[in-house]
Swiss-Prot record:
Keywords: Antibiotic, Antimicrobial, Immunity, Innate immunity. This is Hemiptericin. One of its GO terms (biological process) is defense response to bacterium. Antibacterial peptide. Affects Gram-negative bacteria.
Amino acid sequence: DVELKGKGGENEGFVGLKAQRNLYEDDRTSLSGTVKGQSQWKDPYPAQHAGMARLDGTRTLIENDRTKVTGSGFAQREVATGMRPHDSFGVGVEATHNIYKGKNGEVDVFGGVQRQWNTPDRHQARGGIRWRF
């Protein structure tokens, strides 16, 4: 997918581009990439430019009739006019277990953790009950 945006007037303007692509996919693994870029200008100031490249991946680690464990990760680099490049990374895992399956729907319990570096550094945990009908 590619998305291009822009707007402008006599002395100012903005243009942005975003491209996403599935790089690899099979029944257990997916890998995708995203690239974004933008420029903006307003007289009498110099133009400002920024961009980002990101790689995301997920993999099913364990899967059976009732349980699924998925791992995920990302790597990202951001650049902007007048700034050093900024890199960030993250990994995570989520487990889902089906506790009820009937004609009115399904009930799952799930839990997951994620660790990110330089985004700023952050830990995240989540869990809950999911009802699908």
